[in-house]
């Protein structure tokens, strides 16, 4: 299965951690970890919040290929 999101890569590029993102979104760090490993996916509203927090477009987080 191909990775749907590139969240882990985007976090690294922005020098941010799973813990930082979890705190900003008010979610459990385990949830962010699951997003980063593509075990589960964030919903569209959460993707929009993540893109604003990291100052990137949603298309930079999602792998459309």
Give the location of each predicted region.
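A short, Lys/Arg-rich alpha-helix, primarily the initiator
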Residues: 1-17
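The alpha-helix within a helix-turn-helix
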Residues: 11, 22, 51
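Conserved short acidic donor-positioning loop in nucleotide-sugar-dependent glycosyltransferases
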Residues: 64
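DNA major-groove recognition helix of helix-turn-helix/homeodomain DNA-binding modules
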Residues: 45-60
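Recognition helix of helix-turn-helix/homeodomain-like DNA-binding domains
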Residues: 27-41
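Conserved hydrophobic/aromatic packing and binding residues within compact polymer-binding modules
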Residues: 7, 21-22, 32-35, 61
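Ser/Thr-centric signal marking residues that sit
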Residues: 17, 30-31, 46
């Amino acid at each position: 299965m191909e990775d749907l999101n590139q969240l882990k890569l985007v976090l690294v590029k922005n020098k941010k951690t799973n813990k930082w993102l979890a705190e900003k979104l008010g979610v459990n760090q385990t949830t962010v970890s699951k997003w980063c490993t593509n075990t589960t996916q964030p919903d569209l509203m959460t993707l929009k919040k993540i893109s604003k927090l990291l100052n990137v477009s949603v298309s930079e987080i999602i792998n459309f290929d």
